[in-house]
């Protein structure tokens, strides 16, 4: 064989092999890892502009993926939010719109569907979703003594011992950064004296200590994410793994967790998929109910009608393209009686407060915090500014309306501004359509306060003992759920998009 014939033969061989590799890469089902943090706000990662918190691994990873600037949760409450993500349904459509409630056992989850289609599915860390969700996992690590203080202890072990012939779906759910804070090797990572609290908190020593401990737990979450990414690369599966990093609700401080504004329901969301080299930043409006359909879309699985969200896969190929016209959120009972609804479009946010006679102090863990104590004391002495004392207003406005381009933290309520009358009416109309189409309701007898909201009945640095002291006569008694009268758990309508 001549030299040139050999050269041509070898070249064709390598071309054929390369083509085969590309074909296999494109046809092979992707793996999925969802890192879901506990109580971390959208702007508490470095890659979202926070220069005080230390998140080097997440920041580095974000440079290899797509940062979502407008990913909205459907609620700012732990179990309702997680169930909403897992089912792709609004909280009142899951049958579990309140904290510590569970969807019916026959509810369909994305883990369920993935498992049925050959995926190896694991939940490791905080579970908090209910029995229906257990059906969807081959393996569950949900015991604190096994998972470690941050809930991340088994993450590497799960990856190392997975069946290598199967694609996988990992639901890696950290306890970080939920109160109470604990002591670990990450404690002291952030110096309180070098921190400046958000403008709605008091800038005093004990608030800075509170914030530093919160940031320390975020740093632990970041470290664990980095460990998993390194292991994916070691195994050679990083490129074919779609990684999502997010939180279930806002930070556990006053003005944040349980709110339906950006500090409560806007989540950090980073998606990395090296096989498609998705890079950049998207401003598109996306809802957390869209996550499950997107995962199923990438897995080439038909998306059933029970999923109210829609796949945002097309947004990934063109991040500048708009996705949703509207996102919706709801706040129902979380320690205290509540009923709020929110809708936002590209430019405006409208909030409906249906229990506006109740001051919006925050959840129980926030009320028992050092940060709240400072706010409470300085409110009595009249030392708070307008933003800080907002949580004590009673009654609150029945309605709120914000211009989002110039009011990123929703400080200037424009509901009485006649210049925005048309925009206000438009969003009110859309919200009402959403309520009707998805079967939402406002029950007369909602679940009432399970705990007192008066500081002073607490045991410092012991939330569990404080809870016992703060229980009311209504503790343990549930009222009617939003959507219950309309059997919303059986309604699959997606609502306005």
Could you tell me what each predicted segment is?
Residues 2-14, 20-393, 397-400, 408-429, ...:
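Formylglycine-dependent sulfatase
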